[in-house]
Amino acid sequence: MSGRGGCGPCWGLLLALVLALGALPWTQGAEQEHHDEIQGFQIVTFKWHHVQDPYIIALWVLVASLAKIVFHLSHKVTSVVPESALLIVLGLVLGGIVLAADHIASFTLTPTVFFFYLLPPIVLDAGYFMPNRLFFSNLGSILLYAVVGTVWNAATTGLSLYGVFLSGIMGELKIGLLDFLLFGSLIAAVDPVAVLAVFEEVHVNEVLFIIVFGESLLNDAVTVVLYNVFQSFVTLGGDKVTGVDCVKGIVSFFVVSLGGTLVGVVFAFLLSLVTRFTKHVRVIEPGFVFIISYLSYLTSEMLSLSSILAITFCGICCQKYVKANISEQSATTVRYTMKMLASGAETIIFMFLGISAVDPLIWTWNTAFVLLTLLFVSVFRAIGVVLQTWLLNRYRMVQLELIDQVVMSYGGLRGAVAFALVALLDGNKVKEKNLFVSTTIIVVFFTVIFQGLTIKPLVQWLKVKRSEHREPKLNEKLHGRAFDHILSAIEDISGQIGHNYLRDKWANFDRRFLSKLLMRQSAQKSRDRILNVFHELNLKDAISYVTEGERRGSLAFIRSPSTDNMVNVDFSTPRPSTVEASVSYLLRESASAVCLDMQSLEQRRRSVRDAEDVITHHTLQQYLYKPRQEYKHLYSRHVLSPSEDEKQDKEIFHRTMRKRLESFKSAKLGLGQSKKATKHKRERERAQKRRNSSVPNGKLPLDSPAYGLTLKERELELSDPEEAPDYYEAEKMSGGIEFLASVTKDTTSDSPAGIDNPVFSPDEDLAPSLLARVPPWLSPGEAVVPSQRARVQIPYSPGNFRRLAPFRLSNKSVDSFLLAEDGAEHPESTHM
C-alpha cells in the first residue's frame, strides 16, 4: 500500500508537468495578445519568453529525477527491468503526450546537447573512478577488441547490407556502397553509456566488465575516424576518391587517437599541478577538477581529435595525484557531484531517446533493411569476439572462457552515440537519412531493452563468475605485492619485457619524479606503504580489543592489564559479601560507576568496582583522543572549518607511531650484549671518555628547561611545513584539557598513546648505567652522543622484554602507578 501511495503523487506531478509543457506555445501566444491589448503600467507581468529555456531545462531535469524515484519504489521492477529500458519507455510515453498536446515533437535529443553537455560527465566519471591496474593489465585485449573489432563490425555490416541490396530484396533505395559503409561505421560502435547502464546492474566479474567497458570507451577513436572518412568520401563522391585519401584516413586514425590521448594526459598533468597549491583555497578545489577536465574535452573537439579519449585519460591519469592533494571534504564533493552529474545525464539521454522516437517526420520504414541490420549486427559481433578471443587466449595468462565470450557478444549494446552520429548526417548528401535514423533507433531500442532484459537471466543461467564487493585483507595485499615483485624479477632475469616489468619500472619512475612534482610532500609520506601497513595493523589491534570486550560483555580487556592470561579473567560482576549486600551498598556501587572524581575515590575505601573505575579512567585517559573545547567559526565563503575527524586520525596515528618507534629503538639499543664484549673493556672506556667529553661537565643537562617538553612535541614529522600550521594552530586555539604529563627528569615512564604490543613492554626499569654502555653496532673507536629523548628518559632494556604474551594493553600509564599499593588489596577474580 505504501508503494502505491508513493507512486500516485509522483505520476500526478509528472502528468501535470507534461501537460504544462504541451500548452507552452498556446500560453506564449496568449501572453503576446494580452500584451498588445493592455496599455499602461502593470504591477505584475507574465514574462514566459524571458525564462522559457532555463525553465524548460529545469522541468525536464526534475521530471527525470522524479522518474528515478518512482522506478526504485518497487525493487521487484528494477531487479528485472534495467533502468535504461524503463527510461526509454517513459520517454516514449511522455513524447506521445507532448505530441498529442502540441501536435509536433517539441523536444528531441540534438547532437550538440548530447556531445557537449550530456556525454562529458558520464565519460569523466568512468575515467576518474577507473580501476587503473585492472584497466592497464588488460589494455592489450581492450585495444584489440576496440580497434580490430570495430573495424570488423563496420566493414562486415556495411558490405553485407550492400550485397543484399544488390540482390534486390530491399527494393529501390538511393544508396551506394559508401553510404552503406558510412552506416556500418556509426552502427558498429559499442556505446559506453548503454554498457555502463546495463553491466553495472548485472555485476559480472571485474575482468569481463573492464574489457567490455574499456572497448566501449576506446573504440571512440575508430568510430570517429571511420565516420569522418566515409562522410567525406560520400561528400566527394565515389569517383573522386583516390588511394591517397585512403592512406590519409589510416593516418588520421593514429593522429585522432594518439592526439586525443596526449591532450588528456597534458590536462591531467596541469590539473594535478594546480591542486598541489590549493591548500589555502580548499573551497574551489572541486571546481578545478571539473573545469580542467571539461577543457580537455573541448580542446580535443576544437582540434578534431577524440574528445572521449581525451577526457577519459584525463580522469585516469590525474586521479592518483588529485585524490592525494585535495582535502577530504573536497574529495567527497568531487565524488558525489561527479556521480550526480553522470547519473542525471544518463537519465536524460535515455528518456530523450524515447521522446525523440515519437517524431513522425524522421520515420522511414523498410522491413528488410531493419531486420537484416539487426541480424548482421548481432551475428558479426559474435563472430568477431570468438575470432579475437581465440587469438588472445594464446598469449593471455588468464583465459577468456566460452561463457565469457557469450556475455561479451551479447553485451555489445548500441546507444545514444549512434543516434547522435546518424542525426548529424547531411540529408542533402545522404538521400536515405531517415531510413538510417529509423533503423538506428530500432537497433538501440532492441539492444538496450531486449538484450538488457535478458542479459541478467543469461548470466545467471550460464553461472558467470560475479564480482565480489569486499575490501581485500592485509594478508592478501601483502601476498599480491610479493607476487608482483617475484614476477617482475623473473621477467627481468629472463630478459622478457612483460606487463609486470613495465609496471615495476613505471612505479619507480612515478615515485622518483612524478610524485615529487605533482604531489605534496605530506601526501607522499602519508601514502607510504609501510606507514599504511602499520596503520592497518594498529587499527586491527584496536578492533580486536574492542571485539573481545564486547564478546565478554564488559570492559574487562582494560580491567586487569597485569594479568598474564586473559582467558582466566572473570568478566562477570563480583559478588558482594554478606556485609556489603545491602541496599545502601548497591546504591553506592551504582553511583561510583559514573563517578569520575578520582580524589573522592582515593580518599574513601574503594571496592572492586571503584578499583575498576580508576583503571578504566586512567586507561581511557591515556589511549583515547584528547577532548578539546569546541569553538565556532565565523561564516566565510572562502574558508571551510577544519575537519575534526581528519585531525583526530592524524594525531592518533602520529602519537601511536611515535610510541611504536620508541619501542623499536629501545629494542635495537640493547640487542644482546655480546659475550666477547668483556675483551674490549679498554676500548669501551676510551669511547666513554670521548662521549663524556662531548657532554658539558660529563653530566646530562637534565635540569635544562629545554627538555621539559610535552608529549605533543613533533618528533615524527609526517607533514611538510605547509601542512603543519593548520594542525597545530587548531590545537592551540582549542585550548583543550591536557591529559598527558610533561616529560621532565622526575618522569620515569613515557605516556604511550595508542595500542601497544606486549612484546615491547618491559617488566622493570633500566639501570641508569645504560648510557655508559656502547651499542653493539659501533666500532671500538666510535662514540655517539645521546639524543634529547635518551637524556630525558632512559631506553628500555632488551633483556627484560617479556616473551610473546597474550594480546593486551600496555600498563605503562603514568597514572596507573597510583594503584600499585592497592594491587594486593583488591585482587581480580579469576576462574579456577
Curated annotation (Swiss-Prot):
Xref: InterPro entries: Cation/H_exchanger_CPA1, Cation/H_exchanger_TM, Na/H_exchanger_3/5, NaH_exchanger
Listed GO biological process terms: regulation of intracellular pH; sodium ion import across plasma membrane
Gene Ontology CC annotation, any one: early endosome membrane
Name of this chain's protein: Sodium/hydrogen exchanger 3
Effect of residue 527 to F: Fails to bind EZR. Abolishes sodium:proton antiporter activity. Abnormal trafficking
Source superkingdom: Eukaryota
Gene3D superfamilies: 6.10.140.1330
Bias type Basic residues, positions: 676-692
Entry keyword annotation includes Phosphoprotein: yes
Pfam family, one: Na_H_Exchanger
Membrane-topology annotation of the record: Multi-pass membrane protein
Subcellular location(s) of the protein: Apical cell membrane; Cell membrane; Recycling endosome membrane; Early endosome membrane
Residue ranges, Cytoplasmic side: 74-81, 129-131, 203-204, 279-280, 323-329, 389-401, 467-832
Span list, region Interaction with NHERF4: 590-667
Species this chain originates from: Oryctolagus cuniculus
TM regions (residue ranges): 51-73, 82-101, 111-128, 132-167, 181-202, 205-236, 244-278, 281-303, 306-322, 330-358, 367-388, 402-425, 433-466
Region Interaction with EZR, annotated ranges: 575-589
